[in-house]
Amino acid sequence: MPESPDSSSNAVPASAHRHGDTGTRFPPRYDGPKLLSEALTQMTRGEEAFARDGPRADVEYRDLGWAAASSGAIGAKHIRAIRPFDAETGWHWHDMSGHFIYVLKGWLKFRYAGVADVVTVAAGSSLSQPAGVAHNVVGRSDDLELIEINMPAGYGTWEVGEGVAAGVHK
């Protein structure tokens, strides 16, 4: 941490970031300072209806508004089951830098390439899935509800062969 002007105290110069970056090495990432009225974005969308326009027919999706609020940097969806689970997703991976889920209700089961055991994420638990990791959703409860957060909001999904389950990458 850079020394403060008075090294005998814990004072931080007004121009310095409290974590030690004086702002001289890196330009700020955002235009600021701003008034709250210029920057506040309402991301809660309780009135937003669920839609059945996602990749799976057995769940419905509700956009939480994060993509619009973050210029596409982050996407968030409320996802819930509407029919019994009828088929695994098949092995695939997503082109994203962050993929997080938080299960509100029920449970979800994954298989991961190179991992022998099924990974279960139950209500009150979360999962951070590293970028590019091949996986297969192999089960879920009929009452599943979760929040999914992705970075970026828009991303590609690629199917991969069964050989991935054995750790063979093409």
Feature annotation, model-predicted:
Residues A57, W93-H94, T120, P130:
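Short solvent-exposed loop/turn micro-motifs enriched in small/polar/acidic residues
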Residues P2-R83, T157-K170:
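A short, N-terminal "cap"/entry segment at the start of jelly-roll beta-barrel domains
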Residues H78-A81, W93-Y112, I149-P152:
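Short, conserved beta-strand element in jelly-roll/cupin
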Residues A122, A131-G156:
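Ligand-binding loop in jelly-roll beta-barrel domains
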Residues A116-V118, D142-L144, G161-V164:
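Short, glycine/charged-enriched secondary-structure capping and boundary segments
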Residues G114-G132:
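Short acidic-glycine-tyrosine-enriched beta hairpin
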Residues A67-I74, P84-F100, G114-A116, D142:
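A short beta-loop-beta micro-motif enriched in histidine and acidic residues
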